[in-house]
């Protein structure tokens, strides 16, 4: 044991010189590259404890190398964290590509989505969500995905899913409905995509209400995308829909999406490219 302790002390107090290093006028070892000391003297009381008068010190070269290693390790940990958040947060791998960097810049609501991310802490504190509504293919889901990706890059957990998947998960869940819904509500931001497209059975509507109501009571923001119109939401067909829409509208700011159908444009471009390849 004594030998092991001595070995540790030796390692702590001994500097291994490089070929270009040299001894300065003060008797300390200096780096041959940056000309800064690689050693420093102990205070007299510490020297008596360690049985030697000096200990290793960082020269500029060593400090730079250490900072670069630490920065690389920090980047690696960040990338690992973001990867895990996206693995858990997205239900479709293509959602990873829905980013502001990949945006074509034509959607007039892109600025609003960016500001939501920039002011996330305020949105979170004040429990401000969004209801993206409008026609098919107008970019609602894409911009919701942009918000999700941007927040995950900041290491903020987000879950983006839809009620078709939620209902399937609830039907197959072994952990119980309450625990599943509680897990959804633990995310700082929950995004429900394509709201209103799920089957309108009594069971389905009850589960939709349970999720919306639980999120409502959690005090955490919710973003919803839907093809329903604002008129549909303000004039529900029955009580079951009314209590769902009421909670949505009380927590989510309606944002209208208009303009061209981007999916149709993409399909048209692909068709034209295919025709060109075939006819050439």
Where are these regions (language model features)?
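Walker B catalytic acidic pair
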Residues: 194-195
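Short glycine-rich substrate-engagement loop in P-loop NTPases that contacts/grips substrate
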Residues: 108-117, 148-189, 199-206
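A short, basic N-terminal segment
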Residues: 1-104, 267-280
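Pre-Walker A (pre-P-loop) alpha-helix and adjacent loop at the N terminus of AAA/AAA+ ATPase modules
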Residues: 88-90, 94-130
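Residue-level preference for the first positions of well-ordered beta-strands
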Residues: 127-131, 158, 189, 221
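Walker A/P-loop nucleotide-binding motif
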Residues: 124-144
């Amino acid at each position: 044991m004594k030998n092991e302790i001595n070995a540790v002390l030796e390692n702590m107090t001994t500097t291994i010189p490089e070929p270009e290093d040299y001894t300065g006028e003060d008797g300390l070892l200096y780096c041959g590259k940056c000309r800064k000391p690689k050693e420093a003297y102990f205070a007299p009381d510490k020297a008596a404890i360690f049985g030697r008068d000096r200990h290793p010190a960082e020269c500029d070269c060593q400090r730079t190398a250490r900072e670069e290693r630490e920065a690389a390790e920090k980047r690696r940990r960040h990338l690992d964290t973001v990867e895990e958040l996206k693995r858990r947060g997205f239900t479709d791998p293509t959602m990873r590509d829905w980013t502001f960097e990949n945006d074509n810049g034509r959607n007039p609501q892109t600025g609003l989505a960016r500001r939501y991310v920039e002011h996330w802490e305020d949105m979170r504190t004040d429990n401000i969500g969004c209801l993206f509504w409008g026609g098919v293919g107008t970019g609602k889901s894409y911009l919701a995905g942009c918000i999700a990706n941007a927040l995950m890059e900041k290491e903020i957990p987000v879950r983006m899913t839809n009620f078709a998947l939620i209902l399937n998960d609830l039907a197959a869940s072994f952990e119980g409905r309450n625990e599943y819904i509680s897990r959804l509500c633990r995310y700082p931001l929950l995004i429900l995509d394509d709201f209103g497209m799920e089957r309108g059975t009594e069971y389905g509507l009850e589960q939709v209400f349970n999720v919306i109501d639980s999120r409502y009571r959690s005090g955490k923001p919710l973003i919803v995308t839907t093809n329903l119109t604002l008129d549909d939401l303000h004039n529900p067909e029955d009580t079951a829909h009314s209590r769902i829409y009421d909670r949505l509208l009380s927590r989510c700011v309606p944002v209208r999406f208009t303009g061209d159908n981007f999916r149709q444009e993409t399909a048209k471009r692909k068709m034209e490219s295919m025709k060109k390849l075939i006819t050439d």
